[in-house]
Design a protein with these regions (language model features):
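Flexible "arm" and connector segments at domain edges
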Residues: 1-117
Length: 117
């Protein structure tokens, strides 16, 4: 994902918010809560389903899953923007940190947490 794409998506969600005069309600705490609630809706799509049933349900619910993931992304973009975070830069830096915490030679094929490797 390019920085230009992230910037364009951020502008879309900022315009949406501005047109509705909703910034007044968007403090960091409530934005984080909203992000979490939307992530909960992603999880709800998968709750109590496993294996082939989960795969079939996600295939049938692809549009809804996309909508819920888009809601999560919208809150991530707004929160990052409002807190002055360059999300592309933060993501690249975090991946570099994770590469150190999870070196391929220790982590490949393992679901263990970094402190258990």
């Amino acid at each position: 994902m390019t920085t230009q794409l992230l910037d364009a998506l951020t502008q879309i969600v900022l315009e949406f918010r501005e047109e509705r005069d909703w910034k007044q309600f968007h403090n960091p705490k409530d934005m984080a809560l909203s992000l979490s609630l939307e992530a909960g809706e992603v999880m709800e799509l998968m709750q109590w389903k496993n294996g082939p049933e989960l795969e079939a349900h996600l295939t049938a619910s692809k549009d809804r899953l996309g909508e819920e993931l888009a809601d999560v992304l919208g809150w991530v973009l707004l929160l990052a923007h409002d807190r002055g975070i360059d999300l592309a830069d933060a993501f690249v830096k975090k991946i570099e940190l994770n590469k150190k915490k999870y070196p391929v030679e220790k982590a490949k094929g393992s679901a263990k947490k970094y402190n258990e490797l």
